[in-house]
Structure formats: structure tokens, C-alpha cells
């Protein structure tokens, strides 16, 4: 189940994933990195997303997936990401979020950056991300750092998006 945007857990900073012991669930069971990857991938695809963070399904650890929901083989796992270098060039572009259904707003983000992270197999590597993939990656990384979707937008863009969502909801009610 996807956690809605007003859930206070989305404002918490997630703890690093421990590959040696896995993630301990509330019921005491242990979740492996591989199992978490497949859980996230399944939820992302089911919700037609391009990224999903563990905290968005109530698992407060530093992990997410990104990829194209129409191509399951494109989905990659990201565990314990750390930005290495960030380009100063930025671009403003519209974003949405699975935890905020129907809400789209313009957000300013760096065009490219270099990051180090591990896959679900625990193997770490460094990669450069650019363009749309960089935007999705940083959006999911914000979730891990407790930074909410709407806090990244300017006040103007937030008001504009909120008004548009209200208008769409009114139209749906009368349809």
C-alpha cells in the first residue's frame, strides 16, 4: 500500500540499509534487499510510476527503484545512494508523485550528477545520471531524506498545482 503525502513518515530521514542483516519489519521478520527490490518494483509498476522509495510503502530504509513501468526489465534498484558530484546547471520541469496522486508541479533540479549506490545484490558502483532519469533519481532521493514533494516547489507553482487539482476534482464530482 502506498503511503499518502500527508503521512508523517514521509518527513523522516531513512536509515541506511544493512546488507549483512537486512531490514527488520515491525513484526520482527527480516526483509532482504532482493525481496525489498521486488516489492518496490511490483508496487511501482502497479501504480504506473517511474520511481518508488521504500518509505512510500512504510519501510524506513534508504532504498528505491526507478525505471519505466511499461518495461519491467528497465527497473533498477538503488540502495544507500550518496551524491558524489553535482552539476550547477539546473532545469525546471513538471513532476508528479505516487504519494500525491493527481498533483503535478514544476520543480527545479540539477541537470546531472554523479552518485554512488549499491544494487540489491550489495555491489556498489558510481554512475552519472542526466536529464529525466536524473530528475526521477533526485525525487526518490528526496524521499529518503524526508524531503516532501511539495516542499521542493516554489510557492507559486505549489498554489498553481493545488488549484488545478481542486478544479479537476470538482469536474470529476460533477461528471
Predicted regions and their residues:
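Positively charged
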Residues: 1-175
Amino acid at each position: 500500500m502506498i503511503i499518502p503525502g500527508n503521512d508523517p513518515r514521509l518527513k523522516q530521514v531513512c536509515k541506511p540499509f544493512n546488507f549483512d542483516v537486512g531490514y527488520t519489519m515491525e513484526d520482527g521478520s527480516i526483509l532482504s534487499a532482493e525481496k525489498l527490490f521486488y516489492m518496490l518494483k511490483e508496487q511501482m509498476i502497479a501504480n504506473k510510476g517511474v520511481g518508488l522509495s521504500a518509505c512510500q510503502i512504510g519501510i524506513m530504509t534508504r532504498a528505491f527503484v526507478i525505471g519505466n513501468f511499461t518495461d519491467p526489465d528497465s527497473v533498477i534498484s538503488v540502495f544507500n545512494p550518496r551524491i558524489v558530484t553535482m552539476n550547477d546547471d539546473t532545469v525546471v520541469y513538471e513532476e508528479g508523485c505516487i504519494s500525491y496522486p493527481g498533483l503535478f508541479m514544476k520543480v527545479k533540479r540539477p541537470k546531472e550528477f554523479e552518485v554512488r549506490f549499491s544494487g540489491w545484490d550489495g555491489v556498489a558502483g558510481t554512475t552519472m545520471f542526466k536529464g529525466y532519469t536524473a530528475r526521477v533519481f533526485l525525487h526518490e532521493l528526496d524521499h529518503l531524506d524526508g524531503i516532501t514533494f511539495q516542499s521542493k516547489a516554489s510557492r507559486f507553482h505549489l498554489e498553481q498545482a493545488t488549484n488545478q487539482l481542486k478544479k479537476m476534482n470538482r469536474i470529476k464530482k460533477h461528471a
